């Protein structure tokens, strides 16, 4: 997001002060939140894929919820742990580095090599014992709606909650934005890869798609949000 007015205000407020700031720019954040979040794609997909497996069984094929254009677009994921560790690195630089870092903007993501949904979707689905497939030619090449599927099968999700003793309030809550998965996975139809050269000059860490997404799903499972 581009908060230009906020950045201008921070520059004005920090001028001549002992404190400074750093502008951190991730792409889609891959992580865990305990109490719902309007932009938490891992939670939306975890609910969808858990329920999909419950209804269709292990080994079922899951069509990508987007289109052929978004399926092949280049992008970078930004896992919450990498973002956090970068922020720690940026805010604990030595005194001689501080002037070089203060007020700077940094793209922050998991890998300098961009990926695609065609590479990520099968990995994400495999966590749930499912097979991720490319967009279908049916329905104009547009894939299914994850949050719509969960809403339509709400009673079956409630069965899962009861059977596995899960936390409630994840389906139909007022904090999660149902259109976010479609926005990210269907409407983003252009390459948007990030240049991480500047980030890696200050702090270098790379995380695979599997490690980033599986860690988020593990945390949802440990919190009893998914079975």
Model regions and ranges:
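Mid/C-terminal beta-alpha module of Rossmann-like enzyme folds, strongest
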Residues: 86-182, 196, 201, 217-225
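Glycine-rich "substrate-gating" loop/helix at the edge of Rossmann-like oxidoreductase active sites
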Residues: 27-42, 66-81
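Active-site loop of classical SDR/Rossmann-like NAD(P)-dependent oxidoreductases
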Residues: 183-196, 211-213
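Conserved beta-loop-beta element that borders a ligand/cofactor-binding pocket
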Residues: 8-39, 100
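Substrate-positioning beta->alpha
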Residues: 2-5, 68-94, 100, 104-107
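Conserved Rossmann-fold NAD(P)-dependent oxidoreductase catalytic core, especially the SDR/UDP-sugar
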Residues: 1-2, 22
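A short C-terminal helix-loop "cap" of Rossmann-like NAD(P)-dependent dehydrogenase/epimerase domains
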Residues: 29, 45-68, 131
């Amino acid at each position: 997001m581009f908060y230009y007015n906020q950045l201008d205000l921070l520059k004005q407020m920090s001028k001549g002060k002992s404190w400074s700031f750093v502008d951190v720019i991730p792409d889609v954040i891959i992580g865990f939140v305990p109490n719902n979040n309007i932009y938490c794609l891992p939670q939306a997909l975890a609910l969808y894929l858990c329920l999909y497996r419950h209804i269709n069984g292990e080994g079922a094929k899951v069509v990508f919820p987007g289109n052929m254009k978004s399926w092949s677009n280049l992008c970078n994921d930004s896992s919450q742990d990498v973002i956090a560790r970068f922020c720690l690195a940026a805010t604990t630089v030595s005194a001689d580095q501080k002037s070089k870092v203060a007020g700077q903007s940094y793209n922050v993501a998991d890998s300098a090599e961009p990926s695609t949904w065609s590479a990520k979707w099968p990995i994400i689905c495999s966590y749930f014992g499912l097979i991720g497939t490319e967009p279908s030619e049916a329905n104009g090449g547009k894939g299914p709606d994850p949050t719509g599927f969960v809403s339509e099968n709400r009673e079956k999700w409630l069965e899962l909650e009861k059977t596995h003793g899960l936390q409630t309030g994840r389906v139909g809550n007022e904090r999660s934005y149902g259109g976010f998965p479609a926005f990210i996975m269907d409407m983003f139809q252009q390459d948007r890869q990030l240049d991480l050269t500047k980030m890696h000059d200050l702090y270098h860490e790379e995380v695979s798609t599997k490690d980033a997404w599986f860690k988020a799903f593990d945390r949802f499972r440990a919190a009893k949000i998914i079975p």
